[in-house]
Amino acid sequence: MTFHEPLPSNQAAPKALLGKWSSKDAWGEPLKLVISRSGGDAYKAVATAKGKAPEEYVFTVSRHGNRWYLSAGVPKRLGGNFLIGGFDIVDGKELVVYNLDVEQVQQAVDKKELIGRSTEVPEDNGDGVLIDSPAARVLAYLDDPANSDLFVEVARFQRSGK
């Protein structure tokens, strides 16, 4: 699922987000994540899985209510636009990353709560949804307490040094 525009960055990320994190992937292999400032209001995450080349992601953050969001550009080869997710930092020692539930967002499009359309995601990644609603409307939808179950945990990292 992608969005036509990113969420506007409205404040710096919490300092606890920066640094080195570690986890295990779905196969139990080590996964390392290093997050740093990238200039302006952007941040850079470099993810390294065992036996694979590092992958770099540039993202911005915004905070609304008690929730932190991230927006990252999607590579053109995968259709472009922006990915939106959420994150929490637990006691400065644990980073939890959330994705949005695709089925619930598709239902919101079907009910006209959001404007969007189905898309084919390149490289055999199946069907996708592109949300065309302006960022203000997307935020109102994400912040609605009725949609609190919209966020699905996709990764949990432990602090692995400063």
For each predicted feature, which ranges?
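Calycin-type beta-barrel ligand-binding domains and close structural analogs
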Residues: 1-18, 24-31, 36-162
